[in-house]
From Swiss-Prot:
The gene is fadA. It catalyses: an acyl-CoA + acetyl-CoA = a 3-oxoacyl-CoA + CoA. Pathway: Lipid metabolism; fatty acid beta-oxidation. This is 3-ketoacyl-CoA thiolase. GO terms for biological process: fatty acid beta-oxidation; phenylacetate catabolic process. Its EC number is 2.3.1.16. GO terms for molecular function: acetyl-CoA C-acyltransferase activity. The keyword Repressor does not apply. Keywords: Acyltransferase, Cytoplasm, Fatty acid metabolism, Lipid degradation, Lipid metabolism, Transferase.
Amino acid sequence: MTILSPKDVVIVDGVRSAMGKTKNGMFRHVRADSMSAELVRALVERNDFDPRDVEDIIWGCVNQTLEQGLNIGRNIGLLAGIPKTAGGQTINRLCGSSMQALHTAAAQIMTGQGDVFIIGGVEHMGHVGMMHGVDLNPEASKHYAKASNMMGLTAEMLGRMNNITREEQDAFGLESHRRAWAATTEGRFDNEIIGIEGHDEAGRLQLCTVDEVIRPDATMEQMQKLRPAFDPVGGTVTAATSSALSDGASAMLIMSAQKAKELGLKPRARIRSMAIAGCDAAIMGYGPVPATQKALKRAGMSIDDMQTIELNEAFAAQGLSVLKALNLTDKQDIVNINGGAIALGHPLGCSGARITVTLLNAMEQSDTEIGLATMCIGLGQGIATIIERV
């Protein structure tokens, strides 16, 4: 039995939307801020606490413009009916934005700057494209390879460096879809997905509760027919072994252990350690390796202590390279057991909290105690969180 100290940071609950296709998907008529507000309301409804206790709403979002602009974190709180006394901020660490939101809230709790936080993230890549309004400095090419801005080519680089074959990537991608669909049909996502109204292909209103990007009918034969998506001459990375562009949001209720006890709320897990790390931008997908190593050191653990792992699948070549570097190639039965971003999609600002929520549910379903959530970040970073069930 884990004994909690008053300032331990605990996860009380976590939710997410289903993941929608970016192109003509089920959330094509739903705004990013509206989708996020639904999740915040769900956290309040699912947990018996006074929202006046919320110190801050911290939201991850990458492209902060259009409907995602003007501090979407604050707008979400107002839309959700959270008392105006709570603050709201928006964080950007690219793909790691909502995990950084978790880390920021945790650090504030640890240092006595609040006890109750709602964190999360969103990206509506159908409404706000990944490169919308982006103007990169031409001088950046003096400091890192120009192709470092092209995520698919960084995956190709990692694949070549680690001798990851096309066949291995196709098998990895196919398994992601298989696991995700099995988790869907067996109800393993039911506790984390909050139904949000969207539209079907014909435009009819529907409650969206199933991830739209999963391909339950995917076969190896289909995947092998696809051409390389980023390097047409010698490439091995295809659309089927890349995380899908998608629309989605995630949210978590975080507080100090002392506050949870006062409110009579049962924590589901505590945060054992957190870390970020940088690496060469040309191999940005390697970032989870140094970030995980830092987090393990801070927790006084080794990779062998991790019982369940969520590794964001930016690309199969990237995921397999990270597994190889962390000596997890032969332990893929504990990694992304409910599928990953290749099958579920990767709405940039959403994914960090999403994989942490999925990790927590997977740990409860598998009855494991220690888990790791980690992900790569564009331009050469990684982020990692180790949690322990309580």
